[in-house]
Amino acid sequence: MPKVQADGLPLPQRYGAILTIVIGISMAVLDGAIANVALPTIATDLHATPASSIWVVNAYQIAIVISLLSFSFLGDMFGYRRIYKCGLVVFLLSSLFCALSDSLQMLTLARVIQGFGGAALMSVNTALIRLIYPQRFLGRGMGINSFIVAVSSAAGPTIAAAILSIASWKWLFLINVPLGIIALLLAMRFLPPNGSRASKPRFDLPSAVMNALTFGLLITALSGFAQGQSLTLIAAELVVMVVVGIFFIRRQLSLPVPLLPVDLLRIPLFSLSICTSVCSFCAQMLAMVSLPFYLQTVLGRSEVETGLLLTPWPLATMVMAPLAGYLIER
């Protein structure tokens, strides 16, 4: 295990650490986009309705949303390296579980577990980059990381189309197994530990539960609205979300080390950025989930054609991401 460095890792170890980060974040991002193209095929193979098969995507996204902050906090407590390795193990095993699933319920459960693994990888990704790169190259490291995320998102539909053209949808998940093993071996060898801390922050379980309920109910309500669920049920979910959210915010304001630093929301520009990001994420998710069904069921496109037709959207994001970063610096 590399020793803690005052200013990043030395070059031989740095390359190995960067590689495991690249593999891990690529898998986590890809699995958020790669299943969309296969949803009609999965629904047919598992004898599920199109509406119920959407939970293959929703389960993964909701698991990430409700656990991301908690894993980030646990990384501060127990070490980013440890959380990252645990995330790789969970992601690897749950990917195998996904491939072996023979019912929609089993696949949905596997995707929930996989989402927790993906959240663990994403939550400590930026913190590990700060430990890996020297301070003078930190901006470059963040830029490379953003580029990998954009490329993985853009490549998702194309990779899915390529795999589905020659193999079963199960291989969308099986491909993670060898990649996960390689990333885990690299992580054990090259990732640095956390720097020493005077004291460890205390994990607040009620905050984690309220965080999960607040964001989980929000995503569930939005998904239910898109699927045409009962407005009464959706309204009830939103009411519970607001009530729990109020208690969650009040508790965060009273904690010395909160799970979510809500005091930052008092900054108008920060609040506007968060609201814009949430709305953008919801709109993109609704479109990326519904478009494969429209293209394959209504327009009669094949899986390969669907993947290619979905590629320009994230590809444009990949092209614009570096430009946006440059404009932010200006």
Language model features with spans:
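Small-residue-mediated transmembrane helix hinge/kink sites in multi-pass secondary transporters
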Residues: 40, 72-73, 126-127, 160-161, ...
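Extracellular/periplasmic helix-loop-helix junction of adjacent transmembrane segments
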Residues: 38-67, 106-109, 299, 304-309
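Hydrophobic transmembrane-helix bundles of small-molecule transporters
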Residues: 165-276
